[in-house]
Amino acid sequence: MKKIRQPIIAVLGHVDHGKTSLLDRIRNTHVAEKEAGGITQHIGATEVPIDVVKQLAGPLLSLWKGEIKLPGLLFIDTPGHEAFTSLRARGGSLADLAILIIDVNEGFQPQTLESIEILRKYKTPFVVAANKIDRIKGWKVVENEPFLVNIKKQDQRAQQDLETKLWELIGKFYELGFQVNRFDRVKDFRKELAIIPISAKYGIGVPELLVLISGLAQKYLEEKLKIEVEGPARGTILEVREEIGFGTTIDVIIYDGTLRKDDTIVVGGKDKAIVTKIRALLKPKPLDEIRDPRYKFDHVNEVSASAGIKIAAPDLEEALAGSPVIAVRDEEELKRARREILEQIKSVIISTDKVGVIVKADTIGSLEALSKELHEKNIPIRKADVGNISKTDVMEALSVKEEEPFYGVVIGFNVKVNEDAEEVAKAKNIPLFVNNIIYKLIEDYEAWIKAEEEKKKKEILANTKFPGVIKLFPDERYVFRRSHPAIVGIEVLEGRIKPGYPLIKQNGDKVGVIKSIKSKEDFLQEAKKGDQVAVAIEGAIVGRHIHPGEILYVDISKDDAIRLVKELRDMLDDTDIEALKNTAKVKAQKDPFWGAL
């Protein structure tokens, strides 16, 4: 028998923009005492029955033509993009819909952009809650009032202020390729993104938000939400945790089928599929019934999607957050489930001996999301695993560093660094990049590479001589001193010269070394093509080794030439290249290497 399940809803947004406040407001919504089904607390989720939505929304339901048939809404309790990336279901996201919350006064922030990127990648439909309208100057607050009623009570200035802030958000979304409008002005919800102005703190606009997501789910996701009630359950692990009296348990969101006490389940482990039998299905007691923290759960015999449930069973110590849970009823289903879970784990947890970065994340879902981003940036991965950054990870990065310094790093999403790992990383100079924003992690890593490349280039530059061709002025008047050192007037014909550069003649014979370069009263660190300067040449005697009108060349080494061609090519201008060609011709007379350059 098929039924429509509650849509699973995630709340995303930047830190302090109101994600938790919104969830708290939804959780603590008071409904009339006579109401049969109130809001119920699941494990890791909050269920809002449709009757509560209807009571809160009242006349707003006319926004949607036809009756809403959903049984309710299931909100994931852990807000933020970290939780969202962990919640996977068959390659996509576990969430059917998302609410992106933005502080209307602060606008877009780094985690806002990260959240939009993730929603776009997972193709998850979402609405925008423009929060903290109560902070707009002069805003009149009426608790739990629908926005469309509340806005009429505001004076012209407050209304205009909100309108300006909304247009700023709309403009930013437009730059990102989204058509957006205030929810009551949207003509087609398939083409336009809806913004609902709200105050999570006071509940203003929350009725519209609940109606809107109920209506969107009903209208566009009905087929996706139809499930086979009697079918075996499928879910995703939110968290693995110890519970007094139960040992290791897993908190699971069930999104398909029915899970029963005594069912056999297959669960994703670090490098295996764990097969175990359910000992207990637990759901939280209502808060007002908890008298003793040891007895905070009620036992249930079965649970149907969508639901958040705690499973107590043997052998769950190595279960992985973010991995699948599949109930099986016979040997054939068991084989299939085991194969499916192993394939999923193997596609995400990587261990190779190739040169690449070390990647760690808190759950298998976030590991998958981070790995995907790195692949898109063509950053190779040597090892990808779940858990905190360990000493072993740092040592692995060290062995990579010896082969390729830019990949000898550890990149960690939403994880901690073990103390011994930090010590080794400092001692061995292994960079650790840790953040809870994926794109920031990659940005930081790329910025580090850029800085390292610049540093390396500077070191190479400091140790590399550039080619240069100079001509002594033919007039004897420009011989200022004949020896110890010889000082003569010259023009740089091609390339560049610097103090310390050795010089050779056209036949390849060594002449001496440039001691200093002077223009009028100033000593220079460099002279380039077209510059007319005086140079002091140590080791040369005018009339014996060098003569007025003679052309001399900077004596670059083979190593200089190789570095110039291979590593500093982008720093050579046309005149440097010309000088290099001329120098190569001179040096080829004595060494065939230069003929092949």
From Swiss-Prot:
Residue span of region G1: 13-20
Binding site for GTP: 13-20, 77-81, 131-134
Annotated keywords: GTP-binding, Initiation factor, Nucleotide-binding, Protein biosynthesis
One function term, GO molecular function aspect: GTP binding
Residue ranges of the region described as G5: 199-201
Domain tr-type G: 4-221
Chain residue ranges for the region called G2: 38-42
G4: region residues: 131-134
Cellular component aspect of the GO annotation: cytoplasm
Family to which this protein belongs: Belongs to the TRAFAC class translation factor GTPase superfamily. Classic translation factor GTPase family. IF-2 subfamily.
Protein name: Probable translation initiation factor IF-2
Organism: Thermococcus sibiricus (strain DSM 12597 / MM 739)
